[in-house]
């Protein structure tokens, strides 16, 4: 229907004014598609809106999951979705009924909406699918759109199943210390060997190229938008396994064909919008889990994470909900090399160490005298090592790539099969480790003053905690606070508080020369200058080295050079700044018993000029996956502290 130009008759301005009021009313009710609905079946639209209201569809769990509504403190709801283009009603972020009515109205329109510029039926296919299930749309009165772009996208997956992928933590990247999760779409025509060609569904913050330390701050407060994307799995494997040297765990989810379809439909919808990315709360693990909820809304997964979300905890939530099936590990390139080297004879290991430094030793008579199968195994392991170090890219990786070409050329001349070596990650299955939060209840003495204490840690793991499921020799403690009640004068106080305490011990050997490091920010009480329990602010950083032996079971020796600043009313000028060092040992005595010894000396040259000698002895005995016993002794000048505690992880 077209418009033709003509001269207005005297009575027509009034009609035009009434028409204008009607248009304004419709736009106010359904801002994006009300006009388009005029050309459709308005009576049928009203009927659908009425039926949806009678059935209370806007209150249904499924609708709230699709719109990402969460309860507010005032008794209402608000969507976690932060892109206005995700909503068809102006008040859709906080009004489920208005958004449902606007969505139904949008389905009658062919207007292109959202960042993807599609009709509402195609931009929000999961909403259309669910509302059609509830209201049984009459295709003659509400014709379905073909949605060719979605159909092509969906068909390319040829989806059979969904796997949750968990790359283990990476200590040298703040955004990856706790691990990461994303989904892999397993195709019907893929085998376990070819699933590396599958596509993944990933959620991540969109960062500027020069984010640096800025990311750690802005990421905490949601200053970056987070987007969903689909990326080939082999690129993610290259990033995590080959470059970052992180073991990858693959959890096949027990989802039906219908649940897989729902998950992919909602993923398509989220390509239209963004969420504000919060490092501790609404992070990758949280929003990836929301896709699983969309697949099966009856399972309340996100309710378990009201404040913060740690990736491995979402894996545990899936397991406890019965959604985890087969579990497969994909060891890192570093793990592959270390396991192969450990299986070598002393002679093979010596040739491996020579070849990775100087491939021309391939021509040495000693190497040529080895049996062909041994030569092949040494060459393959050397190639794995060189590939690991060439993965960094650019000029830094060029020398390793040149060496690897010589190694591969020599291997191609040997017509023997590869030696089969079982490769298991050094880290046990992450979801089978202890809980990420911990509470300690104990008692002890400080300078002959008895006390009872309780210690609560929000996350994550320290050097003495049971190691299965966690990165060996790594400590990440977040929001740790200890309270004590001293019998003397019945005094209760905060003994220690630490928002962040990180230690990364990286044992050096012929394969790795990564430095160890640590950082600690917090408060602890000190006995100094006549003040028995003065609050003392601490900022400590250190860098050093570690080495590993196996004299008994396993021992790690470490040494740090460090700098420290203190602030307390106990000090002259209320502060002191200095430096020094720490040496120590961390030992696995048995599978259940761990021991730690350390000694420190610091000289404070600024502020309150003083020396500080410290000793620490700690021991932990594991009772079960989530229970342990611990004893600790801390000594500083004129200050001795002993505590016995029972630890519960959750």
Task: Please give the residue ranges for each predicted region.
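Low-complexity, highly charged intrinsically disordered N-terminal segments
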Residues: 76-158
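Repeated loop/turn-to-beta-strand initiation elements of outer-membrane beta-barrel proteins
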Residues: 462-469, 504-512, 550-558, 587-597, ...
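Outer-membrane beta-barrel "beta-signal"
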Residues: 456, 620, 639-650
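Transmembrane beta-strands of outer-membrane beta-barrel proteins
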Residues: 437-441, 477-479, 513-521, 555-563, ...
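Glycine-rich catalytic cores of cysteine/serine-nucleophile enzymes that process amide/ester linkages
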Residues: 158-243, 456, 485-493, 589, ...
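Outer-membrane beta-barrel initiation region
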Residues: 150, 281, 285, 329-473
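Transmembrane beta-strands of outer-membrane beta-barrel pores
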Residues: 443-449, 460-462, 480-489, 501-505, ...
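Active-site nucleophile-His-acid catalytic modules used for acyl/amide transfer and hydrolysis
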Residues: 233-308, 568, 633
């Amino acid at each position: 229907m077209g418009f033709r130009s003509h001269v207005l008759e005297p009575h027509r301005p009034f009609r035009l004014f009434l028409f204008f009021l009607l248009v304004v009313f419709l736009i106010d009710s359904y801002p994006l598609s009300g006009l388009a609905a005029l050309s459709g079946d308005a009576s049928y639209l009203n009927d659908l809106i009425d039926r949806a209201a009678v059935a209370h569809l806007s209150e249904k769990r499924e609708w709230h999951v699709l719109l990402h509504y969460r309860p507010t403190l005032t008794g209402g709801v608000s969507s976690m979705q932060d892109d206005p283009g995700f909503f068809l009603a102006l008040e859709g972020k906080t009004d489920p009924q208005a958004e449902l009515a606007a969505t139904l109205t949008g389905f009658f329109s062919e207007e292109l909406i959202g960042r993807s510029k599609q009709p509402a039926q195609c931009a929000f296919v999961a909403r259309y699918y669910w509302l059609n299930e509830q209201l049984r749309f009459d295709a003659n009165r509400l014709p379905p759109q073909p949605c060719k772009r979605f159909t092509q996208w969906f068909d390319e997956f040829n989806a059979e199943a969904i796997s949750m992928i968990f790359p283990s933590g990476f200590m040298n990247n703040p955004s990856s210390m706790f691990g990461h999760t994303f989904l892999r779409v397993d195709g019907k025509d893929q085998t376990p060997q070819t699933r590396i060609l599958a596509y993944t569904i990933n959620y991540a913050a969109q960062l500027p190229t020069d984010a640096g330390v800025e990311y750690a701050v802005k990421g905490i407060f949601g200053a970056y938008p987070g987007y969903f994307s689909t990326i080939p799995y082999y690129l993610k494997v290259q990033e995590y396994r080959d470059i970052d040297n992180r073991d990858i765990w693959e959890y096949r989810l027990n989802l039906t064909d219908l649940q897989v379809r729902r998950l992919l439909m909602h993923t398509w919808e989220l390509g239209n919008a963004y969420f504000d990315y919060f490092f501790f709360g609404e992070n990758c693990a949280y929003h990836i889990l929301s896709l699983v909820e969309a697949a099966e809304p009856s399972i309340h997964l996100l309710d378990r994470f009201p404040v913060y979300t740690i990736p491995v905890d979402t894996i545990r939530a899936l397991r406890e909900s019965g959604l985890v099936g087969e579990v497969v590990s994909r060891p890192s390139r570093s793990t592959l090399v270390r396991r192969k080297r450990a299986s070598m004879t002393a002679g093979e290991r010596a040739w491996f160490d020579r070849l990775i430094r100087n491939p021309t030793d391939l021509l040495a008579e000693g190497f040529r005298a080895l049996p062909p199968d041994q030569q092949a195994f040494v060459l393959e392991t050397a190639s794995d090592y060189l590939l690991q170090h060439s993965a960094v890219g650019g000029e830094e990786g060029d020398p390793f790539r040149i060496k690897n070409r010589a190694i591969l050329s020599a291997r191609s001349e040997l017509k023997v099969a590869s030696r089969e070596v079982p490769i298991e990650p050094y880290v046990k299955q992450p979801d089978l480790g202890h809980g990420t939060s911990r509470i300690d209840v104990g008692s002890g003495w400080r300078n002959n003053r008895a006390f009872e204490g309780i210690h609560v840690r929000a996350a994550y793991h320290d050097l003495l905690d049971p190691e299965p499921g966690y990165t060996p020799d790594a400590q990440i403690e977040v929001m740790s606070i200890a309270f004590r009640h001293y019998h003397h004068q019945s005094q209760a106080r905060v003994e220690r508080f630490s928002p962040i305490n990180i230690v990364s011990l990286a044992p050096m050997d012929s394969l790795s020369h990564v430095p160890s490091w640590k950082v600690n920010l917090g408060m602890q009480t000190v006995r100094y200058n006549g003040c028995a329990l003065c609050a003392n602010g601490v900022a400590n950083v250190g860098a050093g080295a570690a080495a590993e032996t196996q004299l008994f079971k396993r021992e790690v020796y470490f040494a740090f050079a460090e700098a420290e600043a203190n602030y307390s009313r106990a000090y002259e000028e209320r502060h002191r700044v200095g430096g020094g060092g720490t040496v120590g040992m961390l030992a696995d005595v048995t599978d259940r018993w761990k021991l730690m010894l350390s000694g420190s000396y610091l000289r404070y040259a600024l502020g309150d000029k003083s020396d500080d000698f410290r000793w620490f002895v700690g021991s932990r005995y594991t009772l079960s996956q989530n229970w342990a016993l611990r004893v600790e002794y801390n000594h500083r000048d004129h200050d001795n502290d002993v505590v016995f505690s029972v630890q519960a992880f959750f």
